């Protein structure tokens, strides 16, 4: 039987009593991603709010959602009748989550979190602010494993190799460059958690996150070896052979923290903003943790010649699809039969006919009249007869990825 939002909140309260007086549920996953697989949409499940950014706080008596200005209208609409209050971030009258908890909880009480869902920086910041009020953070297992009936499974789609003719550099070349940068930082190893950084380093892609061609995994690079932590079912024979050729060791995703606890390395570079607290805390105490940005972000920001060619080619292909769509739009909309959803489908169809099309980088969002203000919501709404403007975003192709925003007046001339 489907639970209401109030029933879900009540179940969570029963779960954390009596040892915990509040629980925080963010929007992210163990890799601190902005966009996550359905398995980790816990904040959406507990609140009914479908935006990509937001944090829910449940106390024994109150429930609140903190989100940014992109989602104020959407959140107000979706939270109606849920018993969850909307807290609009960045407004002077809105308390921070830690200020809210400091005011709501008496000294000596506890706030529960899943350490896999918060960065090291976030945890340390919350601990500093809450400890000033004698409120402690308690690390808990994920309560959704018990409470969320029919929870979607962990991502199971297989990984695949991204062809070097598009990547421009081999996996071994990239790892060599990373090791060179590690020496400059006097680090023997580095732990990568960000999914885009792992995908770039290994030239591996996947379909684990909608519109994001990444593979849920961790990557450890030391002076002498590289270890990919990934669910076994995601490794096809082709991928296994490829990783062996690149001298990448494969370990089970679920064994990441166990492996780090036995790590035989004198030092490891970890980014406290991109590493979850649980993984960070699992490192062998004998291994010195060097806090800092992993070299991957800067290395992948420097485009090689093949990547630059790919950008140009992808822009040309998407430009052709866009021109065809605009021509169709001018003649189709005045008929009054097109909806925001049908326009979305038509734009997708024009793009899908282009060579090397690999899917959307962002679901097209078409907004007419008052829906133009709800530029973060994609859902089937009926467009009115006299459509005068549309807003939409762009797609991804195998050669490159980007986003396009347009406001159109019909007729276009």
Question: Across the structure, where does each feature detected by a protein language model lie?
Answer:
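Conserved helix-loop functional segments at active or binding sites
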Residues: 331, 349-357, 371-375, 399-403, ...
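Short, solvent-exposed loop/turn segments at the edges of secondary structure
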Residues: 51, 214, 361, 388, ...
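Beta-strand segments within the central parallel beta-sheet cores of soluble alpha/beta enzyme folds
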Residues: 339-342, 363, 392, 406
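Flexible, glycine/threonine-enriched loop-and-boundary segments that flank and lead into catalytic domains
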Residues: 348-352, 365-392
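Substrate-binding cleft of carbohydrate-active enzyme catalytic domains
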Residues: 300-306, 310, 388-397, 410-411
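Conserved hydrophobic/aromatic beta-strand scaffold that supports enzyme active sites
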Residues: 55-57, 218-220, 365, 392-394, ...
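Flexible glycine/proline-rich, aromatic-decorated loop/lid segments
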Residues: 80, 282-296, 392-413
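Terminal domain-start leader segments
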Residues: 1-341, 345-346, 352-359, 370
